[in-house]
Regions:
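Rossmann-like adenosine-cofactor binding region
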Residues: 3-75
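C-terminal helix-to-coil terminal segments
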Residues: 68-124
């Protein structure tokens, strides 16, 4: 399958990010786009996502949902064009080694009084 664009959500759940991908933002995605959520479930408005999926306009792969475990009767299970994994996306053989290396690097920068990597500033 060829996707016109891929949106990957990798961010923490905060007051600002809750329902960040609501019906309005989902509607801004290109036809044929793929939404991948490996962040936190409540970042995506699940009802709006189900509507978009069932329209066939976009597809999605979600490793997280706004209710975990997702109830067996939840409409997301029956939505078109969705892959649901059981919150295991970050569990790889390389994860711990890379995470330790990143944390060590950030702590060294902090101790040296240097700017940290990967800092997100509100409003930018």
């Amino acid at each position: 399958m060829l996707f016109r664009s891929v949106v990957i959500l990798i961010l923490p759940l905060t007051a600002e990010s809750r329902n960040l991908f609501d019906a309005r933002r989902l509607a801004l995605m290109k036809d044929g786009a793929l939404l991948v959520n490996v962040a936190r479930g409540p970042i995506v408005d699940t009802n709006a996502l189900v509507s978009e999926l069932n329209s066939g306009r976009i597809t999605a792969a979600v490793d997280v949902t706004d209710r975990e475990p997702l109830p067996s009767d939840h409409p997301l299970w029956r939505a078109k064009g969705v892959l649901i994994s059981p919150h295991v996306g970050g569990n790889t053989t390389a994860f711990e080694k890379r995470a330790r290396k990143l944390i060590e690097s950030q702590l060294n920068l902090l101790a040296e009084g240097k700017p940290l990597n990967n800092v997100i500033v509100a409003g930018n």
